Design a protein with these regions (language model features):
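Hydrophobic alpha-helical segments and their helix-loop boundaries in membrane
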Residues: 1-277
């Protein structure tokens, strides 16, 4: 039995009645849409996972999503120019989804940096394996918290479902038409998501920011009443302790806020998909 016959049998078993080369081209387009989130978002791998594992995970996701593209395989062009254009389109969709899905994780890192700056602990650095970056102590804590919340909510399942929905709304062999509101609406939505990044960061950091502000105010009053007190050196001891205390007493508020913001993020994902359609 020759190789061509084996390929024909494999093609028939997959339910694909087109040339096998079209199937490979379609799968390459699918991988271009799937791999950016696998590579860039912490919960699907991020920088901590070896490239071989990320490629394997992307391949498995592609196999899971394969039934959604069976009707689109025949429409994939064999022309190199048209195929490259479709590949760029898939990369654009994948990168856009990666940006929207990763908004809460980026906001958590910014929130942690704000907390460390206000508490004076920003000189201490830790390596966060999810993003392979040196970040401050509370940035690390915030990133780990939102990652655990995301996985506990089954957010990774929702993201995979969003990929399936994207294949229905924007097939591999078709370009985005922006029929709903035009391309400017998509650009405006991405800008609003970017603005939400800082709003979420402030929301996650607000309990500690308020506590450190009150601490600074109290120390300022002490300095006015008793100038002989070395407030600067006192603050170096008090503010980190206050930050840790408030962080752990208000952690339920931070977790509730993270849950709420994930709902907002999932809404942004579906809105972006509708605008791309």
């Amino acid at each position: 039995m020759d190789a061509s016959h084996l390929l024909d049998q494999l093609r028939d078993s997959l339910g694909v009645h087109v040339d096998f080369s079209h199937l490979l081209l379609a799968f390459a387009l699918l991988m271009a849409r799937v791999l950016p989130p696998v590579i860039l978002t912490p919960f699907l791998g991020g920088e901590t996972v070896p490239n071989e594992v990320k490629l394997g995970l992307g391949f498995m996701l592609g196999m899971v999503l394969y039934p959604a593209i069976t009707s689109q395989v025949a429409g994939v062009p064999a022309s190199p120019v048209l195929f490259v254009a479709l590949m760029l389109k898939e990369l654009f969709i994948g990168l856009t989804l990666s940006f929207v899905v990763g908004i809460v994780f980026d906001a958590a890192q910014i929130a942690g940096n704000l907390v460390d700056t206000m508490s004076g602990t920003n000189q201490a650095q830790l390596m966060v394996p999810q993003i392979q970056q040196q970040v401050s102590l509370f940035s690390n804590l915030q990133i780990q918290l939102v990652t655990v919340v995301f996985l506990s909510l089954g957010g990774h399942h929702i993201v995979i479902q969003a990929f399936g929905e994207s294949l229905e709304r924007i097939p591999l062999d078709r370009y985005p038409t922006f029929a709903m509101a035009g391309s400017w609406a998509l650009f405006n939505t991405v800008l609003r998501v970017y603005g939400d990044l800082f709003r979420i960061a402030l929301a996650l950091a607000s309990p500690v920011l308020l506590a450190t502000f009150v601490t600074d105010l109290a120390l300022g009053l002490i300095n006015r009443v008793a100038p002989q007190v070395q407030v600067f050196f006192v603050a170096m001891q008090i503010k980190p302790a206050v930050t840790v205390l408030i962080m752990f007493t208000s952690i339920h508020l931070i977790l509730d806020r993270a849950v709420h913001e994930y709902g907002t993020m999932f809404g942004w994902v579906h809105q972006v998909l509708r605008l791309l359609e």
